[in-house]
């Protein structure tokens, strides 16, 4: 698997499309470190800011995150979720930073995990980076992604009795919601 990921190529165009040259994506340093150490992932290239983007299967998230923490990625800047559309997977995204003394610019990497809508579960990274606490709770509250092993996974923005996941693209807003008086 590691050899397959060494260089990713775009699929050849179909009969109706114009032929363009195949683009070869060379691994970044983080992806190369993970591949050299046997961690399965897919290298998706770099974003506009030059940050590596990796896709990880949910079963490999914790081992891969533990390896990245040991490699020096000591700060989870952001964990968020998003919906690719009705019938499409949900995504949990992690933006990790390697902060070190004397560095001109911190090293960064983004991980994404695609989850089926019917079973959006994955392990919590709270035990690696404590900054995941409220971020995972917000993602749970808005998208219904369950972070197994989180110490206090409950709604953080919506009322506890709210039904549904408001930021999913297939969410239907209720016509009426009765707020309980706090007194």
From Swiss-Prot:
NDH-1 can be composed of about 15 different subunits; different subcomplexes with different compositions have been identified which probably have different functions. The keyword NAD applies. NDH-1 shuttles electrons from an unknown electron donor, via FMN and iron-sulfur (Fe-S) centers, to quinones in the respiratory and/or the photosynthetic chain. The immediate electron acceptor for the enzyme in this species is believed to be plastoquinone. Couples the redox reaction to proton translocation, and thus conserves the redox energy in a proton gradient. Cyanobacterial NDH-1 also plays a role in inorganic carbon-concentration. It holds the Pfam family Complex1_30kDa. GO terms for molecular function: NADH dehydrogenase (ubiquinone) activity; quinone binding. GO terms for cellular component: plasma membrane-derived thylakoid membrane. Residues 1-21 are annotated as: Disordered. This is NAD(P)H-quinone oxidoreductase subunit J. It is a peripheral membrane protein. The lineage of its organism: Bacteria, Bacillati, Cyanobacteriota, Cyanophyceae, Synechococcales. GO terms for biological process: photosynthesis, light reaction. It catalyses: a plastoquinone + NADH + (n+1) H(+)(in) = a plastoquinol + NAD(+) + n H(+)(out); a plastoquinone + NADPH + (n+1) H(+)(in) = a plastoquinol + NADP(+) + n H(+)(out). PROSITE patterns: COMPLEX1_30K. Its EC number is 7.1.1.-. The keyword Lipid metabolism does not apply. It is found in: Cellular thylakoid membrane.
């Amino acid at each position: 698997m590691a050899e397959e990921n060494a260089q990713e190529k775009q699929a050849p165009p179909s009969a109706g499309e114009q032929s363009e040259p195949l683009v070869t994506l060379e691994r970044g340093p983080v992806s190369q470190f993970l591949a050299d150490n046997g961690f399965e992932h897919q290298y998706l290239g770099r974003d506009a800011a030059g940050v590596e983007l990796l896709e990880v299967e949910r079963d490999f998230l914790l081992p891969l995150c533990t390896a990245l923490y040991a490699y020096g990625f000591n700060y989870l800047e952001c964990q968020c979720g998003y919906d690719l559309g009705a019938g499409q997977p949900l995504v949990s995204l992690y933006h990790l930073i390697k902060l070190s003394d004397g560095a001109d610019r911190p090293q960064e990497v983004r991980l994404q995990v695609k989850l089926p809508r019917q079973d959006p579960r994955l392990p919590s990274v709270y035990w690696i980076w404590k900054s995941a606490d409220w971020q995972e709770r917000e993602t749970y509250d808005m998208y219904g992604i369950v972070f197994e092993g989180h110490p206090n996974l409950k709604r953080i923005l919506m009322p506890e009795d709210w039904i549904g996941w408001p930021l999913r693209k297939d969410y239907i807003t209720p016509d009426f919601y009765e707020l309980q008086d706090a007194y």
